[in-house]
């Protein structure tokens, strides 16, 4: 008998699939014919209706399984064997019949074979019309059934079948599975050319399928729960069998006869047949036994046995589907609310993890059984009288419907609430309450009608949340408060309530949850918030009476054992630290070593502390380990023990006497103190007073994970950030730990080197892996196995160390840190983008008077200081972090921990985990990061509560190779993510739509391919960051932006490539001001007046990148006033007219880049008068007028730090002595006309760097003169000069050997950085800081020798 998966062999047929697929189709239809042929051989098939009925009855008595095969598509093993034999014969007759063109031939051969078989039972039928005769017989038989078949009584109804197996629930479920499996075939086949195609719509067939599945669920539920006498269940199981068998007959009645195709039965007849079934034409299955009575009977049995029933999770038997079984028809108007509740129960059960439901299983069963009793009882009542009142119904049923509905309501609400809560992340951003409060105000204004009945509750909630804002501020600003754990727990509860409020309000607006449920839910939220506030106030009152000394007596001291083992690696570091300990300043000095966990800080410090050449220079040596939680007394006792020996009597002394005793012990002597594992500045404050400074070169070694602690403790020496191991050091450590004094076998060295490299240069990881290898056989196969499994093993073992650092993170930093798990391995992360994402995710808690971006930068610096994030690039001008990354160990931790916390799930393109496999664990995550489109499609049905969808791809070119089908697919599935706040598609593929239905969206980044943006984009009224990148980036086509964009008042960052606005003047005059907009790129202005209008509408702009095109000649020249907040301005020319038609005035501008313009000294001088705070000036592709000179007078750029000239046609730079008093960097790229760098640069004391790239020899010479003066005369040891020259050297030879020799000779010259060979044009391109005359001399010699 067919199971669910067996229907695959009946899938749609395609001519291109070949003969094999066509033979399968023939097999399906012909086997159906063969079934009836065998029946005719027994004399059972005739045109008489009663005879056919008897056939069905007899077949059922003989073999129920075989009867099922008569009505459905399944093929018995016997018939399959016959067909295989037939195929073997046919192949032997026609071996070449494997081609696609053989389809007609096979059809004809099989038909003739069938006709021959039929002729043996009907000799009077000729060979030509035999097949048509039997086809006609079957067709007429179907006609009689269609006209007269009333779904008659069967032997099962009279209990005449004694086979106990037919009454077993397993048999019933298997039979229903078979029918469902074969019905699925008909639904899926939609190719009219297929021989199995059923014409007409499939909606009713699908409804029949649903009814069968629900019946199967009910059977399963009853079999799991009911322990009543057997006869009760026998009646129910018999009924289930009969319903399924009737469906098999319905299927056969509308299945096409072979050869008739669509002409056998028109769609209307099919629809009527199915409608008859759906309208319950089966009125009874036995005289006096109502169909509903069967259900009522079995439900009553269930109700009486529920307390003793097996405690089996409801979802395992499909009970969430059971309440709606066959209830569409017969529900009275009064019961519509009940049906709505049961549907909500069903829909939410599938989102509820087992652990959250287990406690309520028996209550759930009871509620569902009660609901079923109500439903099936109403069937009978409706049939009797349509106008019965609710009182009449209550009296007829013997119970009170409103009272019976209340437990159902309570259970529905409980399941809905728990289903939502179970999917919330356990890590939250403190900024979520800020977002909710803003939205509550907006929602009440936009949807006042929908929310009218909740007005009072929403106002109370808003007031309560606002009153909690000061507490959330304390959580951020005082992360080490004594009540840290309590505060964080309360903060978590508050944010979870904010999530619930958002969900309930949205459900109310969209009519997704009934009003009674919403009101109950909001009242519960108000009550819970009140309890949270009371808890906070109570604990804070207690705290006011307590001392605020943090953690001094909370635990015993964790001592660090003395370590004398040989250290491997860090030889250069050790030597440097040794010099600092023995030499340097006469006063006390603190040698601070900081770095991420596992680098070996403690090992290194102990190595120095135990170095005899070091220790011998000090009078007293003592050490202590502070740890995260410490006892001040235990620290003092440990130090005294090392300094003067053990004395138990000291334990009785108070802390201040112990501290004074230790201070006096050190006072006259030179001491070396090791203070290990300091976590906070306060811990150092507690100890530093014990270490007197008497100018005798005493030293303190301090280790910490945090840069801020190391910097805080430093006195003279700068903190040492301990680097990671090099590859050579990694291998040496691994070899030492595994082999001791021996050497590694040559056979193992290659795999050993690979393992050492895979450890990520982290000493701790290397030691852990060495421990694994030490316990294994020294065989290549064993080591290869370790190498193959290294990623998971090493990271799992080292997780405890990272976990400790994570555990002590302040509450507000945990979500920021875990969010790194969304990024790809070994990728540099743009900090501006990261901060915008953090803000959009509500990780950043607002603070009055401070920008969210500034606060977020502080969060990042905190993570960097804790060595959890590595800086890869800082800005030259202000030192801000521009790019960062995570070590792989930390990144893996973020991914794993984020998944555990239900916070973020990263799904790779080849990941086997699908939402269906975790439907009862973590059905939804707050954030999903995908690497493939297929992943998103699989998860789209599980994304209703997902807050972020981020695409990451390992192929940087993927976005440009994506097909439009992806864009179409994602446009259909994105509405499923209704609570989406971040959608980052930038690195995946381009789209041709804007998802304007995502009302909560705050961050949208994508690549687009169209020429315009729809005006409906303003529907995204929560949008704060909009980044659209043009896939036509090579063409610089202008994008038309709708006027409605300027109505999006929450926008903070708007980045659209080269856009212009419809009817700019009218728009900008009438639109609102965008007070929150801080960065804008790249508007395209045709007129200066339009730019002025735009600037007036964006009064708080901080960064602007725009293109200017002036259509007037001569241009109207005046001062353009930019916002006083503007700090970065980049102007690009976008037409042939090169003059900037305005003078730039921006009093707080720090960064200015001009590209493509024609400038002169006067313009730059007048502009400089308005830019007194300018720190960075970049001129790119600029033409200078006035004899190609730029004259800069005194005090024109008083704050300028960086001056960069690229492709500037400037011959002479005339600079006054005090023109650039604070300049730090001068960069000249491809300024080929420039004659020299002015000599006044020699006297700029702040100058640190000059870079000359592809400029004249005179410029290089003047740069060297400046270097000489700066270094030798001014003692500016920090000055650096970089010379990059490019020389093009032609050659005539085509001899590759000679070219190679010349290449090697040139590369050996001093200062050569790289050489490129262009064989087609026969030239060398030489780059480096080389002596051009020397290069030419060498080239001349090569030519003379015939080598070039």
Swiss-Prot record:
Biological process terms in GO annotation: plant-type hypersensitive response
Residues annotated as binding ATP: 595-602
Superkingdom of this protein's organism: Eukaryota
LRR repeat start and end residues: 977-1001, 1051-1074, 1123-1147, 1151-1170, 1171-1194, 1197-1219, 1220-1244, 1309-1332
CDD domains named in the record: RX-CC_like
Gene Ontology, cellular component aspect: cytoplasm; membrane
PROSITE patterns, alphabetized: HMA_2
Coiled-coil annotated residue ranges, if any: 446-469, 561-583
Membrane topology: Peripheral membrane protein
InterPro entries named in the record: Apaf_helical, Disease_R_plants, HMA_dom, LRR_dom_sf, NB-ARC, P-loop_NTPase, R1A-like_N, RX-like_CC
Domain NB-ARC: 552-848
Pfam families in alphabetical order: NB-ARC, NB-LRR, WH_DRP
HMA domain ranges (all copies): 1284-1348
Note: This protein is encoded by the haplotype B genome of the allohexaploid Solanum demissum.
Functional note: Confers resistance to late blight (Phytophthora infestans) races carrying the avirulence gene Avr1. Resistance proteins guard the plant against pathogens that contain an appropriate avirulence protein via an indirect interaction with this avirulence protein. That triggers a defense system including the hypersensitive response, which restricts the pathogen growth.
Protein's name according to its UniProt entry: Putative late blight resistance protein homolog R1B-12
Species of provenance: Solanum demissum (Wild potato)
Phylogenetic placement of the source organism: Eukaryota, Viridiplantae, Streptophyta, Embryophyta, Tracheophyta
